[in-house]
From Swiss-Prot:
Amino acid composition bias (Basic and acidic residues), ranges on this chain: 336-346, 715-729
SMART domains xref list: FYVE
Protein name: Lateral signaling target protein 2 homolog
Zinc finger (FYVE-type) stretch: 899-959
Ranges of compositional bias, category Low complexity: 411-423, 732-745, 756-769
UniProt biased composition (Polar residues): 295-310, 391-402
UniProt source species: Danio rerio (Zebrafish)
Record-stated family: Belongs to the lst-2 family.
Domain notes: The FYVE-type zinc finger mediates the interaction with phosphatidylinositol 3-phosphate (PI3P) and localization to early endosome membranes when not monoubiquitinated at Lys-87.
Keywords, ordered alphabetically: Cytoplasm, Endosome, Isopeptide bond, Membrane, Metal-binding, Ubl conjugation, Zinc, Zinc-finger
Annotated stretches, region: Disordered: 290-323, 336-360, 390-437, 715-777
Example GO molecular function: phosphatidylinositol-3-phosphate binding
Residues that hold Zn(2+) 1 according to the record: 905, 908, 929, 932
Domain of life: Eukaryota
The encoding gene: zfyve28
Amino acid sequence: MMNRFRKWLYKPKRSDPQLLAQFYYADEELNQVATELDSLDGRKDPQRCTLLVNQFRSCQDNVLNIINQIMDECIPEERANRDFCVKFPEEIRHDNLAGQLWFGAECLAAGSIIMNREIESMAMRPLAKDLTRSLEEVRNITRDQALRDLNHYTERIKEALRHFDGLFAEFELSYVSAMVPVKSPKEYYIQQEVIVLFCETVERALKLEYLTQDMIDDYEPALMFTIPRLAIVCGLVIYSEGPLNLDRKPEDMSELFRPFRTLLRKIRDLLQTLTEEELMTLERSLCISQDGEFPTSSTNDPSASTGPDSQTEELEKEKGVEEVVDLTLFVTQEDSVWKEEEEKQVLPESSSESEEEEPIDADLACSMQYDEEEIEQLNMMVHQVGDEMSTLLSPPSQNQSPAHRPRPYNGSSLEGSSATSSTQASPRRAPGSYHDDDRVFFMDDLESGLSSELCRGQLPLPTVCLRSPEGSSCNGWLTVCQSSDATNLGCQRKLSQSTESVGNSDRMVNGWEGLQDEDSVQTAEEIANRTGGMKLSATVIFNPHSPSLSDLAVVLPQSADAPEGGEGGALVATQCLLNSCVCCAGGCVDNHEDAMEPAGRSMALGFEKHKLTITSSVIQSAVAAGSPGKGNGHLPLTLPPSQGHLTHSVPNCSVQNQAREDEGSQDGIHYPCCEKCSPGVLLAQDRGSGHEGGPSCTLQDTGCQTQHNASVKGRSECFGKQSKDDNRKINSSSQESPLSSVPSSDIDGVSVTTCSLSSSYAPSPVSSLTTSSDMSEDLDHQEIQVALQAAKLAAHNKIRSRFHSSSDLIHRLFVCISGVADQLQTNYASDLRSILKTLFEVMATKTDQGDNEKPKKGPCLGSAVLEDCALCQETISSSELAAKAREGQFEDPPEWVPDEACNSCIACKAPFTVIRRKHHCRSCGKIFCSRCSSHSAPLPRYGQMKPVRVCTHCYMFHVTPFYSDRTGI
């Protein structure tokens, strides 16, 4: 009774702008529609029921909007946190989301279950009941206050609003998370990094004129494909520490690129071998949407015409950019890259099967496919291309895959073919299998790492020639040039010694093929143990029984009368281990031969990752590189400086055995020695060795007598006896000083003491080479640089040797990068669309927006009003429109804007093109693009009872904002 009097006395006017008055009439309208809907039988009049349901949801949304404004005015500092809303997909972030949540809460509270979300529905039902009760309480309290004082909010209202706001925020997160995937805070942050990468990519593309600002402002459709492609290149090469940093853990990567992690590693390694010109060519190609426009003209490989001097200049440029990293980490990471997934696929052996797969590879070259069959092929592209591409980027495996086992071929010898042919560029290819060259990729299983390949001799190595110091040194270090001697690529290489006193024992190893004695196979670790447990400066492991060991040879100074022989496996392995200069206490390792008279002589250097450690006194490193071939991207390799063709002997050697001294001091012997230790160099003089004319050195005699005419076998046996005595000495010796033993080996003898950086023999005043710790650190740093550069050269040459030319490499990169980028359009369309939308907002030309830039605090009725919208200017209520529809009083539909009068979308201003077509809204008659008019709803005021196309604005504010035949409740 009191409420009736209060309503009669204090009922607010409909025109009152105060929020409590607006809420009163909005709540009244909602109750009227709810009452009519309850009394209606939906089976008898389904169309009427549909209209009432849509009107009911519209009224709910109106009530919630007003409550939201009341909370902003009543409890502005006590609102619930809604930062999680930024993680919601763009499709559901609109002003009428609150009404949908209310409708969902009522359905759940009444016992309904969300389709395919039974568990989530059961979990949310208690929260939904609490929310509906709280909302009813807020409505009753606010309605009662509207009949009292419109300018005052009681404490009871504030408390009810706080409780409702917290429950509503909790239900919003739970309900939306159950319906659509919602990112975690970490995933959202990673996506923000991807957006930054895309923006940086576009900014760089604008500077390099790959793109134009007009294309950004006009929302060019081709940019949806171009920008992700360029972003992959920039993320792997330019901004390598960003979200595409492949050194991160997989869970730290964006979910967009995580499935392509292995393939991205391969792409990154290929991109790092490109020159600046090749990279620009690739990026320009990625900006072309039609594959037919890809440049197919074969260009000469820039590396083919790049001389040692220009390579040195390029290296100096790279030094200014790249940090010198720890060599152990570098090699470990390089090896780990090649081990991941190469066992997953093996190409068929028969050429007919390979030829059948060629059309598939040809189809992969297309970056955009629209019919169903090609889309299916595109979905398979990432895995297929990734597997096939592994061979291009990976070193050969320890066990050859069936596709690359040696095949019989007639009349084709390696020596008879061109030294620069593509089949010789990679010794892994069988000379008769030329059809492999036409394939997109080859496949090798990556069972083992690069060190195992060195053991088996299956890794091609670069031709290194040492030249005279004049005009060929770089900061005192010799450079590497490609040997012009084509015979270095042959199967047979010679190993000879220049010792005159033991000429009868000289041996020549022809391709290592004659070494079949199992006992002659010696690893570096075994030799280290036999020589007293010393840490060798160069760890090289050879397997003389490898069938392809002809590609791995050590060329030493050769005497004219060196006879050939089939023995000496242990000798060869030991010679390789001793083939380094260890004259400096700080660890100066020279991985080159110093007495190579022919300029075309090559030297093979290798490393084993398990033995590769870097300390202040020990560096066990060597170089693995690819054989020169067509398409190689040669990088300069700097080796420790040499005095050219050194012929200096070591006069100041203190020995305990005269026979050993006679052998070690002959004029014809050339000791591996670096520039820092050779006579006449200031650095050697500053070491305070106490001797002039050359470095001090000491031969540690162990009681093993060596005869001048002893055979190699006898020397090996003597060498084995010596190791026992050495081991006894090691156990009792002191290791207080990291003094180095100078190598004094005869080139043909293995019984002499090996060179070492961390010898455990007792220090001798005569053999000590003292130096400061600073000098040692400097030398270590230089050696790390040398080994790092050598390893990079090896990896780059290995990769480039598998391609015919530069254009071939660029085209295959184009295929792979386009495949990954275009796959994002299918697998992650929503995320990519959100990223590109933010990108266009940031990179588009800024215009003066005035008051439109003011952020909205929340859903607001005023924000829905458009000045040029006739429907927004109407004052008629939705209930009046419903009454007219019931009476059959239909209005005339609005006039359509002529097609020629509009060239861009009314909403997003995107220009219309052949792809972006014009669409009229049936509610307002204006022209929109397909994205801005993607909704359908009935228009009862115009007599349209079936859903028709309407724009987003009309759908949200003027017709049936919640109509959808895809409702999940």
